[in-house]
Amino acid sequence: MGCRRVLSLWFPRLAAERALRLERGLTDRPLAIVRRAGNLQTLCSLSRAAEAKGVHRGRGLQDARAICPDLLTRAEDPRGQAAFLAAVRRWAGKFSPWVAEEGAAGLLLDLTGCAHLFGGEAALARQAEQECAAQGLTVQLGLADTAGAAWALARFA
């Protein structure tokens, strides 16, 4: 058997895209998911429309409203997001029997011995990306020999 291969799937807009799935009429509106920690409210997930208006993840809510006055917000729902990620994890099981959640918005798949079933690593990654897009999910992929390298490629390459 060849070397270990790990695919990292990172969903940078997972919480916002989950909210858009729940409220279908918001798809073209700028939407931010807001995390509250004490009196501090920060944006933890953004729709594509919000990012296009110049809003960035990690920014304070008041600053974001100054940049984008029509910004819609929804409170962060960690339990709902975890359940949604678990559903995505079950879907990803079609590519590998070993799928693990990585943080609140990522998955790691051990592709060792599995990729040939999909026509190779590139074809498997392409299929995963296309199926995510068809479901309205933005995904960034990283493929490497170690989980750490795959994680970094998905987020920074």
Walk through the language-model features, giving the residues of each.
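Residues that scaffold, gate, or flank divalent-cation-dependent active/transport sites
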Residues: M1-L108, G113-A115, A122-Q130, A134, ...
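Short, low-order "capping/linker" segments at domain edges
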Residues: W151-A157
